[in-house]
Amino acid sequence: MQPFPDQTFTRADLLIRPAQPADRAALEAIAAQIWDGNDYLPRVLDAWLNDPYDGFFVATLRDRVIGVCKITRLDEGEWWLEGLRVDPAFQGHGFGRILHHFAVNHVRQHGQGVLRFSTSSENSAVQRLARETGFSRVAVFLPLGADVLAEPPAHLAPLTPADAPRIRAWLDRSAHFAACQRSLEWDWSFYFLTDARLAERLAAGLVYGWAAPDAPHGLRGLLIINSTERDRWPDQPVLKIAYLDAAPTDLTALAHDARRLAAQLGRVYVRVKALDQPDVLSAFEAAGFRCESDHHMYLYAREVSLTAHASVRLNELPPLSR
């Protein structure tokens, strides 16, 4: 898409409004220019356009859609920012900054609780936006992957809803769980592991307990996996680990068992976002996992409050023109 010939814009030219079905073609055109055409945006448009909380917005410049952002209400008091995109032809004018400020301000005016988002360590522009709008970087993860192991799991067994109390008690004692912000990860989004989410995962058969031979009835480790419903290639399902935790001495063995479980479930590969701590990464490496990227994943968070943190005011942003 070609920019406007004069490349000069005023505040009156820009409008941020709720996205509409008629915007689909423009949004797909923007997505086609991002990540070598592998942007996930086209795959979630239907869900986002039907968001019951109306958190899907586009930025238009002289009636042309040039940017997009999504505010997702994950639960009561739990908000997630995602989908910030600007047409490459219009980058460099501050539109991404305006969209980010708009999204933060919108949540502050209409919500409460915690607002979070994730981004790549290479995205310095978004990191600057995070700092100026009162976010803190609360955790760092590294994407790892491994081939499956075609042998039975040694000590993993599915857990049931009846196990929820002992799982919660075990998690509440886990320093790793606290460092992971008490959250599950699924395709770059993080969800607080509430009792309701734990119950849903248990009912779906997505939670496994790990017990060593010397304590067959005790919980020594925990593995929570994601379903395959978001897989891009359903015929080649990947075991995406939402959360994996064990004592440092058991972590490598549990990660090995996760690879075995993947084969048992008919998955072709295993992926996990591992907490960026030396002992954690070493344990995964010993279990055959390797880095899939040189870039880290940063998790940012801030409280939703009209008085806390940075002041976010659209009328204080810089002019749009160069």
Q: What are the residue ranges of the model-derived segments?
A:
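Conserved GNAT acetyl-CoA-binding A-motif
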Residues: 107-122, 129, 264-274
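Conserved active-site alpha-helix within GNAT-family acetyltransferase domains
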Residues: 97, 109, 121-139, 276-292
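A conserved beta-strand-loop-helix scaffold within acyl/acetyltransferase catalytic domains
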Residues: 28-62, 67-84, 223-235
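Conserved catalytic-core motifs of GNAT/GCN5-like acyltransferases
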Residues: 73, 118-119, 136-150, 290-304
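Short amphipathic alpha-helix that is part of the acyltransferase structural core
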Residues: 2-43, 148-191, 318-322
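Amide-forming acyltransferase catalytic core, primarily the GNAT-like/NAT-type
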Residues: 133-234
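A short, internal acetyl-CoA/4′-phosphopantetheine-binding micro-motif in the GNAT/acyltransferase core
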Residues: 84-91, 120, 239-250
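Conserved acetyl-CoA pyrophosphate-binding loop and the N-cap/start of the following alpha-helix
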Residues: 90, 94-102, 249-257
